[in-house]
């Protein structure tokens, strides 16, 4: 089986040798190129999510949605981003300029870092850490601090209240999220995202953790929506209550960065759902898998399939994640916003006991299996 990542790396190293570039410099160039490709790809993914949300929302409300900016309005998000980039950046007169500027950066940067441990294919990952899933939880917990800093630096009561809500919401739902991830790690025997996907692929479609951990999947789904501050859990920026929450005093590109961070977090969350519960890059779907086995009997076709394998893996991962995103977007128009007390009760009195009970059941099953 061809390892395409190693193949490309070896080709580049051979090219660097011909150009008499040192090994350390060539490795630095490879890391920079891989990171740049990931950032560009993730940014394009965010633009697609924004367009998809607008189109799905328009369909739910019997509207047309984006139409004029490109075919089917596909570049409307890019046009809006350029518009925000050209707008004036206003700083509140009595606000803290340093904290006001640091808020958007603290929100966006950690979310980009979490993509380091997301496997888009068997060998398509920037950093296969042994603690990949907990690295994601640890890094993503920094984001509410940025929202709190942004609200405090704005010197606005609505902004500060939105930041406090974001911090309370994150603390409430990170614990059930971590317990669900720990249950998956117990089943897989590893905290590595690659190992978790490979454990599921051993048993095909029915080996996905979605079937083995249905309770954990539901708890993870609700917790991830709350972590991403999606409706019905968008209390930190509730327009009817807090004007625009922590974004009230922001304008221009800083205002746009909050939305970029929100959609980056949503995409990362959907990718982790795919990795943890939906088999990752594994294409073990009934009927389609059998057809692929019949076609691959030819040696020529088999070699072609080996060459195309990384593309198929990336396409499979993204297809599953956008399929999950479709249901996340639908919740925006089907469920009403909850109150703050209902939000905290749901996290502490419902999801936490369920996630803890699911962890105990998983641990008991694991002990019985080993014994």
Curated annotation (Swiss-Prot):
It is found in: Plastid, Chloroplast thylakoid membrane. Keywords: Chloroplast, Membrane, NAD, NADP, Plastid, Plastoquinone, Quinone, Thylakoid, Translocase, Transmembrane, Transmembrane helix. NCBIfam families: PRK06076.1-2 (NF004741). NDH shuttles electrons from NAD(P)H:plastoquinone, via FMN and iron-sulfur (Fe-S) centers, to quinones in the photosynthetic chain and possibly in a chloroplast respiratory chain. The immediate electron acceptor for the enzyme in this species is believed to be plastoquinone. Couples the redox reaction to proton translocation, and thus conserves the redox energy in a proton gradient. PANTHER family: NADH DEHYDROGENASE SUBUNIT 1, NADH-UBIQUINONE OXIDOREDUCTASE CHAIN 1. Belongs to the complex I subunit 1 family. This is NAD(P)H-quinone oxidoreductase subunit 1, chloroplastic. It comes from Adiantum capillus-veneris (Maidenhair fern). The lineage of its organism: Eukaryota, Viridiplantae, Streptophyta, Embryophyta, Tracheophyta.
């Amino acid at each position: 089986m061809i390892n395409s990542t190693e193949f490309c790396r070896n080709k580049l190293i051979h090219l660097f040798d011909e150009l008499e570039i040192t090994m350390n410099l060539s490795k630095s160039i490879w890391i920079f190129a891989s990171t740049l490709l990931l950032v560009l790809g993730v940014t394009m993914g965010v633009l697609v999510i924004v367009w998809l949300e607008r189109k799905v929302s328009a369909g739910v409300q019997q509207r047309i949605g984006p139409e004029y900016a490109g075919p089917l309005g596909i570049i409307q998000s890019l046009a809006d981003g350029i518009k925000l980039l050209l707008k004036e950046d206003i700083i509140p007169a009595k606000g803290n300029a340093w904290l006001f500027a640091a808020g958007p950066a603290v929100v966006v940067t950690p979310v980009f870092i979490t993509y380091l441990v997301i496997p888009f294919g068997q060998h398509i990952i920037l950093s296969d850490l042994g603690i990949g899933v907990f690295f994601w939880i640890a890094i993503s917990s920094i984001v509410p601090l940025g929202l709190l800093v942004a609200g405090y630096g704005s010197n606005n009561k609505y902004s500060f209240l939105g930041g406090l809500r974001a911090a309370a919401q994150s603390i409430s739902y990170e614990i059930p999220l971590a317990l669900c991830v720990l249950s998956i790690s117990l089943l897989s025997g590893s905290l590595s995202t690659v190992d978790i996907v490979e454990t599921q692929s051993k048993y095909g479609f029915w080996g996905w953790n979605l079937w083995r951990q249905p309770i954990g999947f539901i708890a993870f789904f609700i917790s991830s929506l709350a972590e991403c501050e999606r409706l019905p859990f968008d209390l930190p920026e509730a327009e009817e209550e807090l004007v625009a929450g922590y974004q009230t005093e922001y304008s221009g590109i800083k205002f746009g960065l909050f939305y970029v961070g929100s959609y980056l977090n949503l995409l990362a969350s959907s990718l982790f759902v795919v990795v943890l519960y939906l088999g990752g890059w594994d294409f073990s779907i009934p009927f389609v898998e059998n057809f692929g086995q019949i076609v691959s009997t030819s040696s020529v076709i088999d070699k072609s399939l080996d060459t195309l394998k990384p593309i198929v893996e990336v396409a499979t991962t993204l297809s599953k994640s956008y399929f999950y995103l479709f249901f996340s977007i639908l919740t925006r128009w089907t469920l009403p916003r909850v109150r703050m007390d209902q939000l905290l009760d749901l996290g502490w009195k419902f999801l936490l006991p369920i996630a803890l009970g699911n962890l105990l059941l998983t641990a008991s099953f694991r002990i019985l299996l080993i014994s």
